[in-house]
Design a protein with these regions (language model features):
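Extracytoplasmic cell-surface/polysaccharide-interacting catalytic and binding patches
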Residues: 25-99, 104-107, 111-210, 219-233
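Short, low-complexity intrinsically disordered segments
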Residues: 6, 210-211
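Bacterial N-terminal signal peptides
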Residues: 13-22
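Conserved metal-phosphate-binding beta-hairpin within the catalytic cores
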Residues: 215
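Intrinsically disordered, low-complexity segments enriched in polar/charged small residues
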Residues: 12-13, 219
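Bacterial N-terminal signal peptides that target proteins for export
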Residues: 2-12
Length: 233
């Protein structure tokens, strides 16, 4: 009994510490082994996670996005950190729109293509194609590389001006103008895309021909696995 009484204060203190522990201390519990929060590896990265909100081609939050954060495989995050360091030395910073994407989000895209069009959203994101044709055109897929955890959608920021570089089209503008090598943009816009592309490739990423913002780690650690844990903090 005396031993139990002596231990009680310590038990109380431990319980109190667990109750008062900041939510951020438990953050890693939501990330499977082999994955990291991008901001933990690249604190300077700006996040604009579009599928958490409504500023995306669906016009609403997408399933599986429970927080406006970015998650990647450890290998992809480390490679992206090298990209960021290189670009920062040139006066630029990276801005991330999407990284790991759960399979449930991809399934949500499939469901969305079967619904009615919102003319306002269509004019902003896919004005020249029917939503039902987005899969056939290569803009959407039933299995996304994002779900493997080593694909990232991003752009460049001018650190001094605090503005995005002009890439000739905005993120998720599902149109040929967003393709690498598009003749529909200016030389300056092409140069901005090339700066991002050459730097990403320098550190082991490969581009996607139809989308200037889309890059995948060439030696990705999970080439055949598609994950479905939520994007959460």
């Amino acid at each position: 009994m005396e031993t139990l009484i002596r231990k009680r204060p310590y038990i109380f203190i431990l319980t109190l510490l667990l109750i008062l522990m900041p939510a951020g201390c438990a953050q890693k519990a939501h990330v499977p082994e082999g994955f990291v929060y991008v901001k933990e590896v690249i604190p300077s990265a700006e996040l604009d996670i579009r599928y958490y909100g409504s500023n995306n081609f669906t016009g609403r939050p997408v399933a599986g996005y429970r927080a406006p954060t970015a998650i990647l495989s450890l290998q992809a995050a480390r490679a992206l950190a090298n990209v960021s360091k290189d670009l920062e030395s040139q006066g630029y910073a990276i801005k991330i729109f999407d990284a790991y994407r759960p399979q449930k989000a991809v399934n949500d895209f499939i469901t969305w293509t079967k619904g009615a069009d919102d003319s306002r959203i269509k004019s902003k994101f896919y004005p020249n194609i029917d939503k039902k044709d987005l899969f056939m055109a290569g803009y959407l897929a039933s299995k996304s590389g994002h779900s493997r955890g080593s694909t990232v959608d991003l752009t460049l920021m001018d650190k001094k001006k605090g503005q995005e570089l002009d890439m000739g089209s905005h993120f998720d503008y599902l149109d040929p103008v967003s393709a690498h090598g598009s003749p529909m943009i200016t030389a300056h816009q092409t140069a901005n895309r090339e700066l991002l592309k050459t730097t990403m490739e320098k550190y082991g990423f490969k581009s996607y021909s139809r989308e200037w913002w889309h890059y995948t780690l060439t030696n990705e650690p999970y080439p055949d696995r598609y994950f479905d844990f939520d994007v959460d903090e």
